[in-house]
């Protein structure tokens, strides 16, 4: 913890998470609110869902490409938790990232609140259960949506892989879009506790809000269990894990890596 706390690069990474999450939430939720303005009679629910899904996915892909080399571009507490459980970041870094992400989401939603104040019934993209969807069903949707996202993050940023020739940010962005295509009609699609938290704070409405923390965190943890222990198990002992969690020395953790300098993942410096 102390080694990271004293590094300028660490705090630069925290600021990057704050700024990138602010931009992500502003762009994505702004696009979701935009369809409420009357622009024509040719809109359908399907068109709206695709538009919003693409906005969320493309904004993640763009920002991941922009700040991935600085902070790793988590922009999502569930992703941060997944990488923590995968022993790729320290506990202190995870905590500071989640705080930065939540504050960024609140700032973005507050700005949107001022810009869209003329909208009637403006919920600022707050996540909630759709009519006919109970809490168990909503929780399940959030778990599955986040599981596939964190699984994609772990797989596309795995330093041991030598077969990746595409873009990790694009793949992750498409995974976010896929999650939204699945979950929008059920929960409004959270799969990102910070994004859900910002809207809940500004609207002062925390109805069913627990689902959008518990679901993504369970999904993220399950993704780590599936990838790190079933699909692509790592050879590591408790000493290695504790070392990463306390000192954040990621480069010394992966004992399976043949060439530590040829990793493909987006890692902070």
Swiss-Prot record:
Glycans are attached at residues 42, 205. Keywords: Blood group antigen, Cell membrane, Glycoprotein, Membrane, Phosphoprotein, Repeat, Transmembrane, Transmembrane helix, Transport. It catalyses: H2O(in) = H2O(out); nitric oxide(out) = nitric oxide(in); CO2(out) = CO2(in); glycerol(in) = glycerol(out). It is found in: Cell membrane. A motif (NPA 2) lies at residues 192-194. The modification Phosphotyrosine is found at residue 253. The modification Phosphoserine is found at residues 247, 262. Its main location: membrane. The water channel activity is inhibited by P-choloromercuribenzene sulphonate and diethylpyrocarbonate(DPPC). The glycerol channel activity is inhibited by P-choloromercuribenzene sulphonate, diethylpyrocarbonate(DPPC), phloretin and Cu(2+). Inhibited by mercury. Detected in erythrocytes (at protein level). Expressed in a number of tissues including erythrocytes, renal tubules, retinal pigment epithelium, heart, lung, skeletal muscle, kidney and pancreas. Weakly expressed in brain, placenta and liver. GO terms for molecular function: ammonium channel activity; carbon dioxide transmembrane transporter activity; ephrin receptor binding; glycerol transmembrane transporter activity; hydrogen peroxide channel activity; identical protein binding; intracellularly cGMP-activated cation channel activity; nitric oxide transmembrane transporter activity. One of its GO terms (biological process) is carbon dioxide transmembrane transport. A motif (NPA 1) lies at residues 76-78. Residues 69-82, 187-199 dip into the membrane without crossing it. Changing residue 45 to V: In Co(A-B+) antigen. The chain crosses the membrane at residues 12-29, 47-65, 91-109, 134-153, 164-181, 207-224. GO terms for cellular component: ankyrin-1 complex; apical part of cell; apical plasma membrane; axon; basal plasma membrane; basolateral plasma membrane; brush border; brush border membrane. Pfam families: MIP. NCBIfam families: MIP. Forms a water channel that facilitates the transport of water across cell membranes, playing a crucial role in water homeostasis in various tissues. Could also be permeable to small solutes including hydrogen peroxide, glycerol and gases such as amonnia (NH3), nitric oxide (NO) and carbon dioxide (CO2). Recruited to the ankyrin-1 complex, a multiprotein complex of the erythrocyte membrane, it could be part of a CO2 metabolon, linking facilitated diffusion of CO2 across the membrane, anion exchange of Cl(-)/HCO3(-) and interconversion of dissolved CO2 and carbonic acid in the cytosol. Belongs to the MIP/aquaporin (TC 1.A.8) family. Homotetramer; each monomer provides an independent water pore. Component of the ankyrin-1 complex in the erythrocyte, composed of ANK1, RHCE, RHAG, SLC4A1, EPB42, GYPA, GYPB and AQP1. Interacts with EPHB2; involved in endolymph production in the inner ear. Identified in a complex with STOM. Interacts (via the N-terminal) with ANK1 (via ANK 1-5 repeats). Interacts (via the C-terminal) with EPB42. Aquaporins contain two tandem repeats each containing three membrane-spanning domains and a pore-forming loop with the signature motif Asn-Pro-Ala (NPA). This is Aquaporin-1. It comes from Homo sapiens. The gene is AQP1.
């Amino acid at each position: 913890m102390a080694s990271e706390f004293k590094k300028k690069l660490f705090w630069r990474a925290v600021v990057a998470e704050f700024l990138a999450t602010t931009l992500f939430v502003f762009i994505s939720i702004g696009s979701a609110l935009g369809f409420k303005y009357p622009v024509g009679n040719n809109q359908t629910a399907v068109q709206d869902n695709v538009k919003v899904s693409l906005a969320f996915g493309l904004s993640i892909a763009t920002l991941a490409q922009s700040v991935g080399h600085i902070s790793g571009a988590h922009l999502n507490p569930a992703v941060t938790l997944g990488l923590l459980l995968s022993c790729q970041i320290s506990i202190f870094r995870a905590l500071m990232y989640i705080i930065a992400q939540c504050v960024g989401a609140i700032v973005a939603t507050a700005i949107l609140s001022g810009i869209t104040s003329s909208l009637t019934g403006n919920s600022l993209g707050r996540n909630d259960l759709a009519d006919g969807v109970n809490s168990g069903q909503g929780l399940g949707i959030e778990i599955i949506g986040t599981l596939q996202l964190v699984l994609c993050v772990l797989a596309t940023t795995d330093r041991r892989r030598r077969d990746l020739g595409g873009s990790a940010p694009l793949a992750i962005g498409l995974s976010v879009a896929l999650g939204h295509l699945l979950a929008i009609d059920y929960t409004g699609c959270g799969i990102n506790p910070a994004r859900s938290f910002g809207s809940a704070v500004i609207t002062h409405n925390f109805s069913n809000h627990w689902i959008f923390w518990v679901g993504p965190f369970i999904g993220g943890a399950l993704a780590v269990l599936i990838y790190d222990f079933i699909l692509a198990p790592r050879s590591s002992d408790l000493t290695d894990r504790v070392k990463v969690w306390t000192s954040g020395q990621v480069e010394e953790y992966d004992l399976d890596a043949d060439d530590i300098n040829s990793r493909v993942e987006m890692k902070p410096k």
